[in-house]
């Protein structure tokens, strides 16, 4: 479903807002120049490092995003009653994951995780800036540490940092 038609931003590119078949909204964009985007940079603080979709129908979401963007399902982690946490792979790079939305939880949505050097400091900055930390800081498989939060206006986001040292 097209929620906002394709729109040009001079010198930047063209974007639109869509909703997938489960109703989850997201923006899609093509840059003004034919180059690989640097918005997703798994090892660079301040950039998106993980894209996580909680959806009502994991298989339909995998088919939709795979068919539109070429994302391939990768390995999976068994999450018990929630099913698989299925990794998304684009050109050999794991860019995120798709999971079933928990029953009774928030509605299906994308959560984008941005890199920070220190998750504890980042969590403190969220709270002192008027935001809310909903989950974390918590360690995830692989050792990275995350928080899931919202800003003072209620927009949700995630942060991810390297494993704590010391």
Residue ranges and their predicted role:
Residues 11-14, 25-26, 35-37:
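Short, well-ordered, mixed-charge alpha-helical segments that flank or form enzyme active sites
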């Amino acid at each position: 479903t097209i929620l906002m038609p394709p729109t040009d931003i001079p010198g930047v590119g063209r974007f639109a807002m869509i909703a997938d078949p489960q109703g989850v909204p997201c923006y899609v964009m093509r840059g003004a120049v034919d180059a690989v985007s640097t918005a997703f940079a798994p090892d660079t603080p301040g950039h998106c490092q993980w894209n996580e979709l909680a959806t009502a129908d994991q298989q339909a979401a995998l088919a939709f995003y795979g068919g539109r963007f070429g994302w391939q399902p990768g390995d999976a982690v068994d999450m018990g009653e929630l099913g698989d946490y299925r990794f998304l792979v684009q050109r050999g790079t794991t860019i995120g994951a798709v999971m079933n939305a928990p029953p009774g939880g928030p509605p299906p949505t994308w959560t984008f995780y941005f890199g920070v050097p220190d998750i504890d400091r980042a969590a403190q900055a969220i709270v002192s800036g008027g935001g809310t930390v909903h989950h974390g800081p918590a360690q995830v498989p692989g050792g990275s540490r995350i928080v899931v939060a919202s800003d003072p206006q209620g927009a949700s986001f995630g942060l991810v940092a390297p494993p704590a040292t010391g």
